[in-house]
């Protein structure tokens, strides 16, 4: 147990006097987010407002967030290497973009060694915490020190005149963020606020207010609407997003977690177009921030084309956003209870648009009908069909969802009527008001398929026991009839009765069970010899059935049970059986591969040339080549290597860098990938389908090159096709792609879990 000094105990109990804001994240190509999640929870508990970005975040993303959120500190966990380049690049970028006062903190367990800690702190990083610091200070002490060092009022940096925020350059956005801090803290001069509201009155910038229950998917829907606006309008419009989350009443801290859901706010080809600021409700006791009217005025003066406000989760009677926005939107899910509950929801009176998100959930179609009917009642629009009400079924979590597109295409004309300058859209029109084309990974009729599997297995076992009982009784009855006939000829009628009973039972015995019993003597003979012959992929493989120990004893590789009772024999054959035979309890192959030691030639560092050299060193003189490949984190996340420092530091670090088919060919050059003694294991997750395709093409091209070398000509189309088919049948290896583990643990998933599982199924089917 750590014995903390009085100094560290005081740090652990530190509470800030100012509103301290932190941006937290795990570094680029790093999915180890357990540590940073613990740190940000302690930060929240100490009263800090935390803008959490999650894992796999580039320096540019973190710095942009810190500047727009006007945070005092950045906290980064880095467990995947490349930390020296990452942190130095962050310090450089902060200085270059007007955030030199923002303090950077980091940690990475034992990955960041003392010499590197000294180097980074000397470069300008506020503090890198080591495991020894954790032991000495305790987690709360470490976080307390971070909060104490960042406990400053940033309102002093706010601009004194409105000209500083009029414009859409990075400098204007930085000044806008600093002004918002002063407005939030109540430190902006009254004269400046009066001028701000006076200037805002002269603008015609539409404001959309998105509100709804907690967990309804407001942030994801906001992100998808912004994505469609940017795609549809050629990324010509500039958007401000104001996102509000609740403060914790006990500690004063807050998790400002909406930014983690935003995937469409980064710079595209035309550069930055979306400014985002997260606000905490603080002590206002509402779903909005007390500073929201001032913040909206600042955004209008800054000259954005559109402002989107997303509130924190609300209850049935809340509608505080309505007077502050031009277009209120209510987001809900199909789970609201009885239809009468809809009569209690205040926002259904005020919302111009209603989105029933998570439309894939049970009862969604009924919810769409009921909500549309309630909106019709609220508006007394009985001359209009409920289907024409502005109620939409959406699935914001689904790529290119037509329900979200329908909502966007209904919203855009309303925004245009309020002054938004829209061009002719490029998105095709959709003719629906809710999500369609819902293809479930597991069809509705098979959602119980795991239970079906369990039922099938239990049923099979019951059948095996019943069949074994029949086999035993048949053997017993026939043996009794034989003994009666031999011992007492006058008992012929009893003997016939026994045979009749046996025949009746034989009729109930399955054909498969009869065949197993018929083949039992042949199986005994086959395993009693010195060799066993089995066919695998049209190849006849002979295997010695005995193994001689060091003491000269002969031991059989497969020993059959010495049963004579037909019931026991059949039960064993149906429930256990020999290796390579159903139900495969002892494996799918009859015997283990011989002539190949179970070694693992593990390599992966630097580029393909270096790792190939390492493979050759490891496998030198070995008859079997069992190559096990580790890929660097850049490859694991499906990205290309780059000279940008936060990427460059991770290229070839703790794994080989593979970005192209040519890299893959170099990696395995000199190894015959279709040789039966060659096996390749690849530890890859997110981009597993792509890497597997590269490997297959490497093996195919290797054999096409071999054909050219052997025959002095190009293969014909038919010959090439036969070579491809032969390679796919004969190549050996393993793709270690456990996407469910990644979803829960290391986070190297670049597609959704559902999509990844579907692709894995498609590959298996192919």
Task: Label each residue range with its predicted role.
Residues 29, 36-141:
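Cofactor-cradling patches in redox/metallo enzymes
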Residues 2-9, 139-206:
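Extreme N-terminal, non-catalytic leader segments
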Residues 208-210:
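Hydrophobic anchor at the beta1->P-loop junction of P-loop NTPases
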Residues 156-160, 378-496:
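C-terminal end of P-loop GTPase domains and the immediately downstream helical coupling element
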Residues 59, 80-84, 110, 123, ...:
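Catalytic alpha/beta active-site cores
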Residues 119-147, 345-425:
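Canonical P-loop GTPase G-domain recognition
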Residues 183-205, 216, 221, 225-317, ...:
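Nucleotide-state-sensitive switch-loop elements of NTP-binding domains
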Residues 78-83, 284, 302-305, 311-315, ...:
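Conserved Switch II/interswitch segment of TRAFAC-class P-loop GTPases
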């Amino acid at each position: 147990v750590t014995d903390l000094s009085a100094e560290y105990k005081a740090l652990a109990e530190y509470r800030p006097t100012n509103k301290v804001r932190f941006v937290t994240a795990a570094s680029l190509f790093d999915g180890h987010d357990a540590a940073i999640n613990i740190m940000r929870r302690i930060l929240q508990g100490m009263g800090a407002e935390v803008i959490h970005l999650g894992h796999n975040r580039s320096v540019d993303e973190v710095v942009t967030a810190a500047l727009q959120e006007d945070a005092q500190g950045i906290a980064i966990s880095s467990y995947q290497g490349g930390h020296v380049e990452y942190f130095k690049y962050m310090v450089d970028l902060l200085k270059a973009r007007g955030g030199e006062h923002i303090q950077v903190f980091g940690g990475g367990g034992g990955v960041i060694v003392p010499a590197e800690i000294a180097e980074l702190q000397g470069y300008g990083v506020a503090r890198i915490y080591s495991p020894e610091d954790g032991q000495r200070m305790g987690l709360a002490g470490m976080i307390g020190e971070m909060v104490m060092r960042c406990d400053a009022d940033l309102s002093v940096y706010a601009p004194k005149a409105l000209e500083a925020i009029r414009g859409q350059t990075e400098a204007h956005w930085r000044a806008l963020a600093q002004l918002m801090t002063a407005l939030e803290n109540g430190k902006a001069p009254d004269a400046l606020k009066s001028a701000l509201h006076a200037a805002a009155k002269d603008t015609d910038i539409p404001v959309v207010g998105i509100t709804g229950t907690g967990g309804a998917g407001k942030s994801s829907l906001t992100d998808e609407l912004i994505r469609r606006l940017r795609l549809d309008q050629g990324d010509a419009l500039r958007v401000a997003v104001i996102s509000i989350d609740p403060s914790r009443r006990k500690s004063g801290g807050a998790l400002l977690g909406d930014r983690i859901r935003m995937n469409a706010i980064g710079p595209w080809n035309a550069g930055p177009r979306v400014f985002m600021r997260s606000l905490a409700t603080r002590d206002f006791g509402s779903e909005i921030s007390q500073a929201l009217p001032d913040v909206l005025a600042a955004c209008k003066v800054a000259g954005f084309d559109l402002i989107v406000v997303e509130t924190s989760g609300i209850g049935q009677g809340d509608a505080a956003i309505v007077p502050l926005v031009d277009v209120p939107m209510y987001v809900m899910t199909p789970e609201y209870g009885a239809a009468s509950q809809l009569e209690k929801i205040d926002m259904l009176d005020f919302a111009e648009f209603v989105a029933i998100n998570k439309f894939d959930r049970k009862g969604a179609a009924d919810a769409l009908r009921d909500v549309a009917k309630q909106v019709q009642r609220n508006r007394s629009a009985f001359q209009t069909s409920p289907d024409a009400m502005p109620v939409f079924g959406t699935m914001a979590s689904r790529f290119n969802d037509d329900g979200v597109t329908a909502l966007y295409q209904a919203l855009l004309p309303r925004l245009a009527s309020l002054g938004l300058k829209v061009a002719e859209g490029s998105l095709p029109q959709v003719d629906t008001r809710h999500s369609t084309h819902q293809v479930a990974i597991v069809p509705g009729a098979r959602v119980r398929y795991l239970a079906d599997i369990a039922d099938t297995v239990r049923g099979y076992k019951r059948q095996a026991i019943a069949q074994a009982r029949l086999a035993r009784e048949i053997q017993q009855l026939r043996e009794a009839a034989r003994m009666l006939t031999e011992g007492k000829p006058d008992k012929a009628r009893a003997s016939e009765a026994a045979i009749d009973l046996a025949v009746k039972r034989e009729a109930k015995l399955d054909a498969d069970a009869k065949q197993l019993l018929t083949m039992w003597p042949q199986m005994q003979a086959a395993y009693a010899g010195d060799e066993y012959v089995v066919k695998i992929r049209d190849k006849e493989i002979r295997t010695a059935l005995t193994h001689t120990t060091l003491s000269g004893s002969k031991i059989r590789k497969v020993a059959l049970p010495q049963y004579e009772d037909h019931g026991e024999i059949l039960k064993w054959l149906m429930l256990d059986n020999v290796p390579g035979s159903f139900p495969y309890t002892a494996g799918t192959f009859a015997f283990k591969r011989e002539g190949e030691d179970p070694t693992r030639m593990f390599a992966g560092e630097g580029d393909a040339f270096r790792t190939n050299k390492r493979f050759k060193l490891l496998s030198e003189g070995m008859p079997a080549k069992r190559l096990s490949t580790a890929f660097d984190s850049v490859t694991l996340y499906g990205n290309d290597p780059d000279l940008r420092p936060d990427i460059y530091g991770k290229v070839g670090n703790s794994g080989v860098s593979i970005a192209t088919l040519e890299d893959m060919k170099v990696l395995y050059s000199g190894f015959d990938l279709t040789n039966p003694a060659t096996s390749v294991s690849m530890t890859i997750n997110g981009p597993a389908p792509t890497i597997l395709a590269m490997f297959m093409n490497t093996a195919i091209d290797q054999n096409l090159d071999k054909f050219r070398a052997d025959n002095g000509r190009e293969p014909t189309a038919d010959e090439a096709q036969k070579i491809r088919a032969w390679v796919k049948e004969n190549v050996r290896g393993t793709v270690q792609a456990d996407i469910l583990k990644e979803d829960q643990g290391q986070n190297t998933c670049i597609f959704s879990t559902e999509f990844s599982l579907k692709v894995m199924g498609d590959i298996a089917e192919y």
